[in-house]
């Protein structure tokens, strides 16, 4: 879960939610 926050431009998923999640999913897929 820590990687999610770091890969989201330093934003917290709890605050943005879907908006940040959309941009984070791409970073997570590339990381794996």
Swiss-Prot record:
It holds the Pfam family ANP. Keywords: Disulfide bond, Hypotensive agent, Secreted, Toxin, Vasoactive, Vasodilator. Disulfide bonds join 8-24. GO terms for biological process: blood vessel diameter maintenance; regulation of blood pressure; vasodilation. It is found in: Secreted. One of its GO terms (cellular component) is extracellular region. GO terms for molecular function: hormone activity; toxin activity. Expressed by the venom gland. InterPro entries: Natr_peptide, Natr_peptide_CS, Natriuretic_peptide_brain. Snake venom natriuretic peptide that exhibits hypotensive and vasodepressor activity in rats. Belongs to the natriuretic peptide family. Snake NP subfamily. Negative results: vasodilation does not appear to be mediated by the natriuretic peptide receptor-A (NPR1). This is Natriuretic peptide Coa_NP1. The lineage of its organism: Eukaryota, Metazoa, Chordata, Craniata, Vertebrata.
């Amino acid at each position: 879960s820590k990687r999610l926050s770091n890969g989201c431009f330093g934003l917290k998923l709890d605050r943005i939610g879907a908006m940040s999640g959309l941009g984070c999913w791409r970073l997570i897929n590339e990381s794996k």
